[in-house]
């Protein structure tokens, strides 16, 4: 960091929040073919090289503090306590797949522990919390404190966070800046609340809550008028007027699953406390870790981490 910046009392460090679990998994799916046995060495090399690439990108743009955000479903996600069907389709798809999910997850969990012990990054990893939770809570915190923030993720769910000042999002998958589809962060968010988000098993307010998990062949989701989405996005009180009673009840369910402003206060507090109390390993540990872990090729580029 520039010495002049450090001496400037008004200087606020740029912070990069990396959607670690999404980036690591998407990279692994591209690099490891079906039926190939995945081991710790393979996953370690892939993750460290991915981190190096994204950290270099962030620091080049002036975001010098790096925060890795982890999905931790060891005891199941907290949203599944509220809605049993949440992301249940993913487990079903994994069971039918010939990709080595067990080898990948076992290895990635070990690498996450290594990152906590040896690498100079804050690793946000709390049982039952998703990377989305960490990113949403910390974006709000850092933005209100005056920091500029870079989210590194290809996930379109984060466009609702673009409403905060000084927030940008880079998609490493598409190698471009993520823009709000509708031009409004509020409309993007409300579209998913009302129409649902199939990839997470969240259904439209016009059908039963577990529609995507229990759907039978031939069932369709009724359409939702864009004018209704926009009206409720601009004034949420309109939801009571424009939706039927059953749709309004479903709307309230979807708020908890999709709108980051509805992350429970106790979860947000736990995230902030975890961040504030995190003890960073010294940079001096990187070299010994690389040598011990068989990453000697990376020792020449330690400054890029």
UniProtKB/Swiss-Prot annotation:
Keywords: DNA replication, Endonuclease, Exonuclease, Hydrolase, Nuclease. One of its GO terms (molecular function) is 5'-3' RNA exonuclease activity. It is an enzyme of class 3 (hydrolase). Pfam families: 5_3_exonuc_N, RNaseH_C. Its EC number is 3.1.26.4. It catalyses: Endonucleolytic cleavage to 5'-phosphomonoester. GO terms for biological process: DNA replication, Okazaki fragment processing; DNA replication, removal of RNA primer. PANTHER family: 5'-3' EXONUCLEASE FAMILY PROTEIN, FLAP ENDONUCLEASE XNI. Plays essential roles in DNA replication by removing the RNA primers from lagging strand fragments. Exhibits 5'to 3' exonuclease activity on either RNA/DNA or DNA/DNA duplexes and endonuclease activity on either flap or fork DNA structures. This is Ribonuclease H. It comes from Enterobacteria phage T4. The gene is rnh.
């Amino acid at each position: 960091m520039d010495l002049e910046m450090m001496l400037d009392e008004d200087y606020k460090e740029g912070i990069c929040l990396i959607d670690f679990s999404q980036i690591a998994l998407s990279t692994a799916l591209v690099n490891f073919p079906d039926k190939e046995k995945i081991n710790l060495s393979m996953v370690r090399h892939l993750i460290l090289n991915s981190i190096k690439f994204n950290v270099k990108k962030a620091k080049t743009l002036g975001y010098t503090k790096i925060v890795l955000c982890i999905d931790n479903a060891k005891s199941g996600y907290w949203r599944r306590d509220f809605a049993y069907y949440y992301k249940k389709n993913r487990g079903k798809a994994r069971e039918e797949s010939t990709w080595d999910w067990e080898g990948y997850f076992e290895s990635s969990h070990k690498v996450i522990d290594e990152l906590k012990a040896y690498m100079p990054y804050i690793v946000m990893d709390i049982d039952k919390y998703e990377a989305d939770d960490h990113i949403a809570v910390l974006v709000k915190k850092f933005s209100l404190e005056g920091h500029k923030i870079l989210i590194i993720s290809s996930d379109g769910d984060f466009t609702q966070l673009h409403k905060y000042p000084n927030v940008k999002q880079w998609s490493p998958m598409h190698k471009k800046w993520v823009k709000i589809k509708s031009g409004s962060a509020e409309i993007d968010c409300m579209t998913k609340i009302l129409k649902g988000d199939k990839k997470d098993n969240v259904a439209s307010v016009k059908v039963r809550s577990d529609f995507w998990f229990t759907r039978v062949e031939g069932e369709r989701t009724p359409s939702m008028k864009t004018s209704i989405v926009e009206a409720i996005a601009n004034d949420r009180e309109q939801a009571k007027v424009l939706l039927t009673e059953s749709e309004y009840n479903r709307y309230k369910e979807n708020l908890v699953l999709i709108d980051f402003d509805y992350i429970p206060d106790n979860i947000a507090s736990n995230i902030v406390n975890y961040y504030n109390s995190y003890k960073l390993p010294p940079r001096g540990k990187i070299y010994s870790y690389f040598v011990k872990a068989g990453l000697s090729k990376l020792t020449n580029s330690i400054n890029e981490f």
